[in-house]
Amino acid sequence: MMWVCNAGSLLPSVEDWFGARHELRTIQPLLTELGRRHPDVGIGVRPRGPLVFRVAERMSLISDALFLEATAADAARKRPVDATGARPTREPGETDDVSELESPPVPPQEQARTIAQWIYAGREGAPKDTNAEFPGLAWLRQPTSYSDREWILEIAQQYRLLTLSNSGSV
């Protein structure tokens, strides 16, 4: 009877480990691409301990790198360079359109797929005719029905599906 109790107490740890392994496989392609683009994100001590902690840290790195990508892309989109290489000046008091920050009226999976396609189109070795146009900051906004973790996982899942379908491994 005692061994049943002991085995039962280990079950949550085993479930966490298998869940974390699955999540790690899901986020790895996106983490690799964003890590290539932003090698300085996440410099420092890596957490040791349960795999779920390490997965959470990697999700945090993805979130940080997505923020950096989006900030740079949004700035470039709002500050186009003219033929002379000069950037237009912004008028004092000019503000961004608030509607640009509202969540897009699409299902969360489509929203995540759009973000994944934007990252995928800008990857190293992407065909020159691939359009890597930034969809806008609103597309990165987490849907209300998703937690932070679920949202990063959804984007990573959509990115992983793109890499698998375009490499013929599906």
Model-derived features with residue positions:
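Intrinsic disorder and flexible coil segments
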Residues: 9, 32-35, 39-40, 50-51, ...
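Soluble C-terminal extramembrane regulatory/interaction domains of multi-pass membrane proteins
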Residues: 58-170
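Charged, low-complexity surface segments at secondary-structure and domain boundaries
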Residues: 12-16, 42-49, 95-102, 136-139
